[in-house]
């Protein structure tokens, strides 16, 4: 793996996965902890046009997880003309972090990406946040939670994404919801379900009806509240599927959710119909 400098102050490691270039960019440092973005640039290069971006947050209950969870989705959407970014963030097992620190990192990542949009060759008005489970919570929370900003962040730069793609997101953290035993009464300012507001970005949600962490009724209620504030929220519920059904190892539903995501992104003007890319 060869080394180069992406910006004067930020070390970038450049490599290849399955023939696709990827960059690792340091976006945040907390004491001795360094957090990186893994960037898959759009393979479609147009000198006068910057690409939309999709930013993926891995799942794992804010406890653990791997930045590689959405690697296959990133490879697909980079071929479709998006710059795809996999975010590493602090978790309990590796960093002794709280969910609140995980959210601070997610917000820092979006701000970094938007601040460096020119360097990354992306359109700062077309940034999609995506994630699964706790990563889905983080993606949603960057859009609608006002609190939990890192003290070193430039809060003049918006951390609000322009669209959301959520895979069985644990977006109810209130009493009876996911993580309440850790979040406690802070859910009032941490739980996306309890903070939906006017201007929330267009959203698509994927869920299995056998999910043991996210009841279908919760997702339906989320959709209802989104529509009450006049924000779009598409919900796809898959029969017989449990938590994590969308991952690449479950190829049938990986393909279905990628296809629906593609259609959604076309509908909001973030993708064109062409070029056709086989989902595999």
Model region roles, listed by residue range:
Residues 49-60:
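Short beta-strand element of the alpha/beta-hydrolase
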Residues 67-86:
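Short amphipathic alpha-helix adjacent to the substrate-entry channel of hydrolases
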Residues 212-218:
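Conserved alpha/beta-hydrolase "acid-adjacent" motif
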Residues 38, 220, 227-280:
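C-terminal catalytic histidine-bearing segment of alpha/beta-hydrolase fold enzymes
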Residues 205-207, 211:
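Short beta-strand/loop motif that positions the catalytic acidic residue
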Residues 97-118, 259:
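Alpha/beta-hydrolase active-site loop
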Residues 108-178, 187-188, 192:
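Primarily recognizes the serine-hydrolase "nucleophile elbow" in alpha/beta-hydrolase
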Residues 20-49:
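N-terminal cap/lid segment of alpha/beta-hydrolase-fold proteins
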């Amino acid at each position: 793996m060869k080394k180069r400098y992406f910006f004067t102050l930020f070390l970038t490691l450049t490599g290849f996965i399955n023939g696709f270039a990827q960059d690792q960019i340091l976006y945040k440092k907390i004491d001795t902890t360094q957090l990186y973005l893994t960037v898959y640039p759009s393979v479609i290069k147009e000198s006068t046009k910057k690409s939309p971006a999709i930013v993926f947050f891995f799942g794992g209950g804010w406890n653990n997880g791997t930045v590689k969870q959405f690697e296959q989705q990133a490879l697909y959407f980079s071929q479709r003309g998006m710059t795809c970014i996999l975010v590493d963030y602090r978790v309990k097992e590796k960093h002794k972090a709280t969910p609140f620190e995980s959210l601070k990192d997610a917000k820092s990542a979006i701000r970094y990406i938007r601040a460096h949009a020119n360097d990354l060759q992306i359109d700062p008005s077309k940034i999609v946040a995506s994630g699964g489970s706790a990563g889905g919570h983080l993606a949603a929370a960057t859009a609608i939670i006002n609190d939990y900003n890192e003290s070193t962040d430039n809060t003049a730069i918006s951390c609000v994404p322009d669209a959301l793609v959520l895979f069985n997101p644990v977006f109810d953290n209130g009493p009876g919801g996911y993580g309440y035993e850790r979040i406690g009464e802070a859910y009032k300012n941490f739980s996306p379900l309890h903070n939906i507001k006017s201007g929330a970005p267009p959203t698509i949600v994927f869920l299995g009806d056998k999910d043991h962490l996210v009841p279908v009724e919760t997702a339906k209620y989320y959709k209802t509240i989104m529509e009450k504030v006049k924000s779009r929220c598409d919900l796809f519920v898959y029969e017989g599927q449990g938590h994590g059904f969308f991952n690449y190892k479950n190829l049938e539903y990986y393909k279905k959710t990628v296809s629906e995501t593609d259609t959604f992104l076309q509908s909001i003007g973030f993708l064109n119909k062409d070029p056709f890319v086989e989902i595999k």
